[in-house]
Amino acid sequence: SSFTIYDTDDSLRVVKDCLKDLNIDEKQFPPRSVLGYISRAKDAMKLAEEYLADCERAGDFRLTKIAKVYVEYQRRLWEASALDFDDIILHTVRLLQQHEDVRAFYQRKFRYVLIDEYQDTNNLQYLLASTLAGGYENFCVVGDDDQSIYRFRGATIENILSFEEQYKGCRVIRLEENYRSTKHILEASNAVIRNNQGRKGKELWTKAGEGDKLT
């Protein structure tokens, strides 16, 4: 059957309506923040009723209220025959995990899987991509662990940091030559990022000149 895809604005509108009808104060529970919690729950593959049960079991009053919004939010999406962006991936992953014939069909269909900006992928995106690549295991990812800036949107740096462990036979190509910056800028950048212990490690260099000193 057909369905409608809700973008972020649509989802926010539904969350606001849910808060209003559940008599929950928007000032204490900002709609965008609530939507973020819902998105992270879906990224963890927690369906609404399951998430509510977990929050009630933990005795977390605030999260329980958010979970009740999640339940109502999903009910309204269902009534509208709508999916949000997270639902699209979540239901696809669940379909592939639960139906071996469907999984095998799409694993045969996609001989190569390539992902750019892999450091910005979340759990659901990882599960979808790795499942599709599970047939031929021709899985190529491009990313920079030093440029992971979207954790607030659910991105998990562990996806790229653990790639070599998950795919033992993979080949890692470090792209360390920089074409945009001067030597002084790269030296400063290398010195700063070197303090981050949670990275693969690389040393940027350039054929460009020294450039101006940093002030």
Say what each PLM segment does:
Residues 1-2, 20, 53-57, 73-78, ...:
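Short hinge/gating elements
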Residues 29-33, 46, 83, 105, ...:
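Alpha-helix N-cap and coil->helix boundary residues
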Residues 58-162, 174-184:
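Conserved helicase NTPase motor core
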Residues 1, 147-205, 212-214:
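Conserved coupling/interface region of RecA-like P-loop/ASCE motor cores
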Residues 21-25, 40-45, 166, 188-196:
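Phosphate/oxyanion-binding loops and surfaces in catalytic or ligand/nucleic-acid-binding neighborhoods
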Residues 28-42, 63, 67, 86:
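Short, well-structured alpha-helical segments
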